[in-house]
Amino acid sequence: MTPHAPATVRRTALAVSTALITALPVLAASGSSAGAAAPAGPAATAPVATVDVPAARAGKKKNKKKGTQKYHHRAKVGAQVLRAIVLDQAPGVEGDKVVDLRIGRAAANINTRKASKAVSTSKTLGGRGLADTDLSGLLTGMVAKAGPEKGKEEVPSQTLVPVPAAPLLTLGVSTGETKARWNGPRTCVPGGKTVTSSSSSTADLAVLPGVIPGFGALLGLDGTVSATQKTAYLPKKRKAGLKAVATTGLADLGLFGDMVSIEVVSDPKMVATATGRPGKAKITYTPAVLEITGPDGSPVPIPTDGAPAEIGIPANPLLGLTIQFPGIINEKVSENGRLAKAKSVTLRLVVTLGGVTIADVAVAPLQTKVKVPKGGITC
């Protein structure tokens, strides 16, 4: 026997032991007796088929889930004429709650995980804690829903007759319309058509009219103002992106019965896009261009970096007014191109009386958000 024979014997014994160990699970699964273990060659292939069947099914489920993940996407968009928070210290406003008025809002949500995939709304007036004032005639909202099957829902333009709501506000004729469209499961609305669109407009708006004697409305907009939103897909070869647009159409503003006037030269607009490709998500914001004239008839310079500016009211030294141009106040864009979201406020007005804040007004707040899968939407 050569010096290498012992190693050869050990390898042979190991090979036999391995064959027996491999065969044992097959015998147990088939119920065969130990005497049937001799033909281990053919039986050794059985565990492969037995074990891999569930694994193959799990793989199919995983692939199916992965395919769904390549489709799921969502968007959120909103445009509003203004939001006014009036504190209970305001003269003439009774009740111990803060008044939160949301005037002229157009909004939408797209979420492929929901039963209603696309929801579009238009609302003339919303809010909470309305100081026990009856605003039921103004609280109108229009909603259009679409999905999961192919189809669309549209609420045509409706007109609201003016209803006085003193001492909080007055509104002229208001209108609204909304539409939502869906193209069916795992598909996208083609051809750049809007998935959602809505608008809300009102005329001759006055917030807290006559609340301070001799000064007219705290804030007035003479003319028609509006808020608009829309969403759509961005076709690109085989995979789509998503876009959301929010904008407002403002009228010139007057504060304290036009003691301070704000001329609107151009309106604000925000667009969010996401494609799922690196570097291809973005927020495009076009700020409003405003010109402000103070009580003495002189132009009022307002810092463009969002810093506040104080404006004195000589006719009533107890009144204080702070004006800001916040612009973009919250923005996030992912480097992988999957997410783009932002919020903005065109103009913020804080009014004090005797050092106490009585109103905080945000003019033309906008928000957009879009999120898509990596590489874009497979539809």
Predicted regions and their residues:
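Extended, solvent-exposed, non-transmembrane regions
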Residues: A37-C379
